[in-house]
């Protein structure tokens, strides 16, 4: 299972229609598009997937549709994290039923939970996942939960934990985690430091921009494996030029707009309160979509 979890995993977006409802057909196309790019797996229902502006039922629908499209073809990780332990457990049970390979959960947020409460939260989810390994999701910039290195070391050694998604710019901490846990599956979470994360000890990555240029990240990983750091750095720079634009326009809405111009997503909208991409940026995103489609071909 550890080998199966390693690799380049796209953090899947969730398409919506003009009425803000789940766009199931676009979701299916997006799954297929990612598989065509040679992605090793999908991380479903996380931050990129706008999980926290969806109902529990919608999140289950997304998991089911993705499993129908991709189960057995690539690795599937279901993000099931909620503030509520019971809701997280429900999603974990659904992920197991749908045939996912692992579950993941962000640290519970908003309320100032104690570290032991965090540990109990993860234990309960693991108990509901019917044997699926847990990918602990550490993203302090969004969760507001700033785990110490000792706390991370404790979480990743809980029974049932198989991996850590480390969405932090702290590469020193990444290396410290790898040094302490040589067999842990460790994901880099920030796309803009993917190459650096691999050099610091990550086995692979989970990222949002993989949806539109997954082949670039696969090429970076290959270059690192082969010791060609110059190529990895050049490719990372090319990825970061795209990321610069996406940050300027809004990452999730920018990605959906690019995918719309690629004829993958019908409607380039995130769920409110996210706003659409500002009109002056559309020509740049259209040009980017064209460039990437030529490169992909």
Swiss-Prot record:
Pfam families attached to this UniProt entry: DHDPS
Amino-acid positions noted as binding aceneuramate in the UniProt annotation, renumbered to this chain: 47-48, 167, 189, 191-192, 208
Any one GO CC term of the record: cytosol
InterPro entries found in the cross-reference section: Aldolase_TIM (IPR013785), DapA-like (IPR002220), NanA (IPR005264), Schiff_base-form_aldolases_AS (IPR020625), Schiff_base-form_aldolases_CS (IPR020624)
Subcellular location per the Swiss-Prot or TrEMBL entry: Cytoplasm
Gene Ontology terms, MF aspect: N-acetylneuraminate lyase activity
Catalyzed reaction equations: aceneuramate = aldehydo-N-acetyl-D-mannosamine + pyruvate
BP term (GO), one: N-acetylneuraminate catabolic process
Self-association state and partner proteins as the record states: Homotetramer.
The protein's role, per its UniProt record: Catalyzes the reversible aldol cleavage of N-acetylneuraminic acid (sialic acid; Neu5Ac) to form pyruvate and N-acetylmannosamine (ManNAc) via a Schiff base intermediate.
PANTHER family documented for this protein: N-ACETYLNEURAMINATE LYASE (PTHR42849:SF1)
Stated family: Belongs to the DapA family. NanA subfamily.
Protein name: N-acetylneuraminate lyase
Lineage: Bacteria, Pseudomonadati, Pseudomonadota, Gammaproteobacteria, Enterobacterales
